[in-house]
């Protein structure tokens, strides 16, 4: 069964829904909010940090973490999956506007394969190091490393993502303008909650003059 639009968060399985999961049909904005809140209530037993460093055309990435337990819930084959993605890629499309901005385009799988590297948390702390050559057509200023601890299993219902992290490949050089118009679909308010594609933080500004 194929359907769009659909949403999947941490590959969690929600009982009582028509769709088999881990992707579910989006009926309305309220359903999205409830689904995200449900995923947020799942406790994570592992922390994760990605540290990319660029030197010319070479990028080295260190991913480290700490597990609060030596085995994750329902673990069968624990993996650490690390990808290199690029945002703000302009491409053509068939209908609507002439161009479309693609975010999260997969540029490289830093792990041995797309399902990740075997991860041993019996010692609680762990670390993986990766290296990749930056291709000329990549814009490293728009790239980020995405890494997540997940379970792999032949059964799609047992591929839970336990925690994830991301880090820009290059440090930002300053504050940039974030579009907030409805057409850009970057910021949405559903039932009084702010939903943004790249996350958000509240900032208070005070005039102390």
Language-model segments: which ranges?
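Short, conserved sequence motifs used for protein processing/export or organelle targeting and
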Residues: 1-173
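C-terminal outer-membrane/trafficking sorting elements
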Residues: 176-209
């Amino acid at each position: 069964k194929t359907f769009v639009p659909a949403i999947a968060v941490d590959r969690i399985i929600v009982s009582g829904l028509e769709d088999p999961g881990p992707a579910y049909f989006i009926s309305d904005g309220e359903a999205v909010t409830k689904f995200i809140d449900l995923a947020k209530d799942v406790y994570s037993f592992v922390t994760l940090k990605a540290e990319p460093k660029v030197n010319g055309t070479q990028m080295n990435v260190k991913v480290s973490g700490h597990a609060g337990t030596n085995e994750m819930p329902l673990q069968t084959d624990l993996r650490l999956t690390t990808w290199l993605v690029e945002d703000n890629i302009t491409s053509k499309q068939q209908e609507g506007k002439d161009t479309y901005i693609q975010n999260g385009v997969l540029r490289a799988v830093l792990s041995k394969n797309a399902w990740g590297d075997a991860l041993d948390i019996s010692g609680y702390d762990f670390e993986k190091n990766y290296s990749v050559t930056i291709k000329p057509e990549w814009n490293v200023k728009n790239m980020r490393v995405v890494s997540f601890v997940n379970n792999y299993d032949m059964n799609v219902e047992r591929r839970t993502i336990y925690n994830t992290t991301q880090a820009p490949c290059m440090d930002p050089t300053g504050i940039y303008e974030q579009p907030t118009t409805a057409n850009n679909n970057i910021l949405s308010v559903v039932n009084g909650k702010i939903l943004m594609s790249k996350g958000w933080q509240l900032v208070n500004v005070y005039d102390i003059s």
